[in-house]
Amino acid sequence: MKRHATLAVRLSFFAVAVTHTAQADTPALSQQLEDLQSFQVIAHRGASGHAPESSMAALELAHAWGADYLELDIQMTSDGELVAFHDDTLERTSNGEGHINDHTLAELKALDAGSWFNEAHPALANPAYEGAHILTLEEVLNRFDEDVRFYLETKSPELNPGVEEGLVRRLEAYDMIETGRVLIQSFDQASLLKIHDLNPDIPLIQLVWYSPAEESEGRLTEWTGVTPGPGEITDEDFQRVADYAVGLGTNYLYDGEPVISQAFVQQAQENGLAVHVYTVNEVDEMQRLIDWGMNGLFTDYPDRLIELTE
């Protein structure tokens, strides 16, 4: 399979994407939407299987290997700065404590966000990771050339009021939207709708998480309620998402068992949505999902996925 070969599955989502990104009136934005018809390698928090997640080292590795998108979670500090950090709290991936949005940027910059990786992965330990800083969005955007695309999540917007306005303002200042260099994702539908209102040219991805329903054995539900479960979802349900988004980002497995099927993927595509699956690290699962006609995969190991798709 060629790295950017158009998928064999006949997709209709491109025309829908153009409709839902206003005029799509710049060549670069139109090219981005066209590229979403091909398979996309999405580096989950950078090459986070090889270096501390959301660190400059992880991002640089993923970019050097040729990932299509560098994926990051965006949160807001107590003094209104945008930073790249996944968890709501600091303990897992830094030597800090408490909620990230309770700290100023200066306080966060004093933390070590790299040594935990060396302790967790001694075979991959690198002294250069010690003392890695939590990155601001501006630092990330300033580091990479204009050919790099980003896949940014509004993380926990209920804990980060104003994150949408701050993010859109920053992306506009860096000409990220008109140049076709950004996708925004969220589990929070209201957050995506707010971004769509702020700038309808931004391509959006609705994240979903399917898991067994507590009250009904064998039935799957989506945890935020944005869609029914995969076994009950209709064309109309997909179309409601396509009113504001160009794609779905979904889990493939729950507790080791598949929660979506190839038919689900094809139905989403037929209703105007690209389908990206998170987070896939095993080569056999990567290959299975590629064979299903997936539009892209999130992975901690972009090198594995790139080797598979070249």
Task: Report each predicted region and the residues it spans.
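Extended, charged low-complexity regulatory segments
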Residues: 4, 20-21
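Phosphate-group recognition and catalysis centered on beta-loop-alpha active-site segments
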Residues: 23-310
